[in-house]
């Protein structure tokens, strides 16, 4: 994972969480392209949990019920479920409240992603049960690493003629 050292280094909040294997519900707040979705997937994989994903733009309570059914089945087999909700700020108060009993019971660990300030967009009852982590925009060097990895994975080689800097 590239960037976000202020969260991921061994002595930083998410780094400690992964080292201690003590996952908690959280909000990942940052600009588009800062790695919110990728980080959620990595956290889930590191913790050995089942990953479910929802988009608050496209889905609602009906889909949440389906996810909760899956989570109950996994829980019966002693496997935890991480529910990643992209654009969580798009859910209304009632939809956000629907997460509360399931976070409190431990059925799901919620990781919400938002580009908006959670203090204004996430209702206080839900926000009080989540830790908020601020992701920073990737800098030029970090974007270069990401771009080079993507190009290498596709066996594309750019000559050192400034083409990469135009991509970034």
Feature annotation, model-predicted:
Residues 16-54, 69-72, 100-101, 105:
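Walker A/P-loop
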Residues 8, 20-24, 46-48, 76-81, ...:
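Short loop/turn elements that form and flank the Walker-type P-loop nucleotide-binding site
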Residues 2-20:
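A short, basic N-terminal segment
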Residues 55-57, 131-144:
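Conserved AAA+ ATPase "SRH/arginine-finger" region at the nucleotide-binding site
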Residues 30-31, 52-60, 114-115, 135:
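A short hydrophobic beta-strand->loop->alpha-helix junction that borders the nucleotide-binding pocket
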Residues 16-19, 85, 89-128:
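Conserved catalytic/switch belt of AAA+ P-loop NTPases
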Residues 6-12, 49-82, 93:
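Short glycine-rich substrate-engagement loop in P-loop NTPases that contacts/grips substrate
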Residues 157-168:
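Short conserved motifs of the RecA-like P-loop NTPase core
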């Amino acid at each position: 994972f590239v960037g976000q050292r202020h969260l991921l280094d061994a002595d930083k909040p998410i780094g400690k969480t992964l080292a201690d294997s003590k996952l908690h519900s959280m909000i990942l707040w940052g600009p588009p392209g800062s790695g919110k979705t990728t980080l959620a997937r990595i956290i889930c994989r590191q913790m050995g949990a089942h990953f479910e994903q929802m988009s608050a733009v496209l889905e609602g309570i009906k889909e949440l019920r389906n996810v909760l059914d899956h989570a109950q089945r996994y829980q019966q087999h002693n496997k935890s479920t991480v529910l990643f909700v992209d654009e969580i700020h798009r859910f209304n108060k009632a939809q956000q409240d629907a997460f509360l009993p399931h976070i409190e019971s431990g059925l799901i660990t919620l990781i919400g992603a938002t580009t908006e300030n959670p203090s204004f967009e996430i209702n206080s009852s839900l926000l009080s049960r989540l830790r908020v982590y601020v992701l920073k925009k990737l800098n030029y060097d970090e974007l270069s690493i990401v771009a080079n990895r993507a190009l290498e994975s596709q066996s594309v080689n750019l000559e050192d003629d400034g083409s990469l800097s135009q991509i970034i």
